Swiss-Prot record:
This protein's encoding gene: hemL
Biological process according to GO: chlorophyll biosynthetic process; protoporphyrinogen IX biosynthetic process
Domain of life of the native organism: Bacteria
Reactions performed catalytically: (S)-4-amino-5-oxopentanoate = 5-aminolevulinate
Designated name of the protein: Glutamate-1-semialdehyde 2,1-aminomutase
Cofactor: pyridoxal 5'-phosphate
Organism: Chlorobium phaeobacteroides (strain BS1)
Main location: cytoplasm
Length: 431
């Protein structure tokens, strides 16, 4: 068991000045218990905490570090920009054109793109744009899909898909809730009912084509195709939220992997290479409604700043030129098969979902295809599993409902270590 004396001291101090002691709730370890770990350094596939403990990192800053932490090409590019160019100007820069052009080349849906500072900004802006473009107010989202902390997304359906949304967080107005409708993931009929009951009122349907904040739940291809067809028929803007799965499950994201093209796409995480960046883009006809060429307002003081764009641009170039995806698939499949073998040896049959290098081991025997099936997990068992893995130097997300990210810099030795730790941790979970 790692000694966390310094982390515990820092957490107590942090709680005096920061709500809950953290700047994002999942970091507080409420789901798994114990002391939140304060990190001091990251290098490659590993992190070291303030107490000197080292961990193999399967969180990867919640997704961005597909190439590992402190990648030499990325850090060198950042250093060059920092020392020779600057951090921000609040003016157009040539690098904005370069990354925009690259995105149009690698993401199927993108004809024009606007850079922002976070995934939440991207999704909020995309929904506003869809409303402006269609002249409609309501949106459909899916239970269990996370689109950031914008008011429109913090809505959960009531007892059924036809009920009006109720705010899922204080501070979200009833008016906002009324304009957000929830459908069931992977269930096209639940969507059709909402569209029929709100004829000509739906501006957008927004979906994570690979849901990553209810564990990992892939959309079924026929479900996504049915959404695409329905949106085309009804004049609804289809938005793929690829903040997490974009550039992760394929270079062109889930839309490349599935072969289904949305009208708008939101991006984040990997596109920033570890620095705060988001983007939204799509059809030229829709994007031309964005100010200043159009009437849908969107702006940002630090949008397109050279430091963040440098990290993102270098990351995308490496992914394009080096094509780590076949090797990422091999590594993630090795873990999946190793975990399955371990469960077979122990007489367990928990569910694993995986798309490319993002995966989740669910502590349930029920196939996980949506929010309702995801919440059948045994959270106490996950907590015991988590702490056993942590004790063995494996850092996973401190929540059952998050993804496990494999990075390109993980070695076969790292993977074998993880499979061995999993065997021990599964037994700890059952104890």
């Amino acid at each position: 068991m790692p000694q966390l004396t310094r982390s515990a001291e820092l957490f107590e101090k942090a709680k005096q000045f920061i709500p809950g002691g953290v700047n994002s709730p999942v970091r507080a370890f409420k789901s798994v218990g114990g002391t939140p770990i304060f990190m001091a350094k990251g290098q490659g596939a590993y992190m070291t905490d303030v107490d000197g403990n080292t961990y193999l990192d399967y969180v990867g800053s919640w997704g961005p570090f597909i190439l590992g932490s402190m990648h030499p090409r990325i850090t060198a590019a950042i250093e060059n920009t920092l020392t020779k160019i600057g951090t921000s100007f609040g003016t157009p820069i040539e690098m904005e054109i370069e990354i925009a052009e690259l995105l149009t080349q690698i993401v199927p849906s993108i004809e024009m793109v606007r850079m922002v500072n976070s995934g939440t900004e991207a999704t909020m802006s995309a929904v506003r744009l869809a409303r402006g473009y269609t002249g409609r107010d309501k949106i459909i989202k899916f239970e269990g899909c996370y689109h950031g902390h914008g008011d429109s997304f913090l809505i959960k359906a009531g007892s059924g898909a036809l009920t009006l949304g109720a705010p899922d967080s204080p501070g979200v107005t009833k008016g906002t809730a009324n304009d957000t409708l929830n459908a069931k993931y992977n269930d096209i009929e639940s969507v059709r009912v909402l569209v029929k009951e709100n004829k000509d009122s739906i501006a957008a349907i927004i979906i994570e084509p690979v849901a990553g904040n209810t564990g990992v739940i892939p959309a079924k291809t026929d479900f996504l195709q049915a959404l695409r067809d329905l949106c085309t028929e009804e004049g609804i803007v289809l938005i793929f939220d690829e903040v997490m799965c974009g550039f992760r499950v394929a270079l062109g994201g889930a839309q490349e992997r599935y072969g289904i093209t949305p009208d708008l796409t939101t991006m984040g995480k990997i596109i920033g290479g570890g620095l705060p960046v988001g983007a939204f883009g799509g059809k030229r006809e829709i994007m031309q409604r964005v100010a200043p060429i159009g009437d849908v307002y969107q702006a940002g003081t630090l949008s397109g700043n050279p430091l963040a764009l440098t990290a993102g641009l270098e990351t995308l170039k490496i992914l394009r030129d080096d094509n780590p995806y076949p090797e990422l698939e091999r590594k993630a499949a090795f873990l999946e098969e190793g975990f399955r073998d371990n469960m077979n040896k122990l007489g367990l049959s928990y569910v694993q979902n995986r798309v490319g290098s993002m995966a989740c081991l669910f502590f349930t025997e029920t196939p996980v295809e949506n929010y309702d099936t995801a919440i059948t997990c045994d959270l106490k068992k996950y907590g015991k599993y988590y702490h056993s893995m942590l004790d063995q130097g494996i850092y996973l997300a401190p929540s059952q409902f998050e993804a496990m990210f494999t990075s390109a810099v993980m070695t076969d030795e790292d993977l074998e270590k993880t499979v061995k730790a999993n065997y021990v941790a599964l037994q700890a979970a059952e104890a």
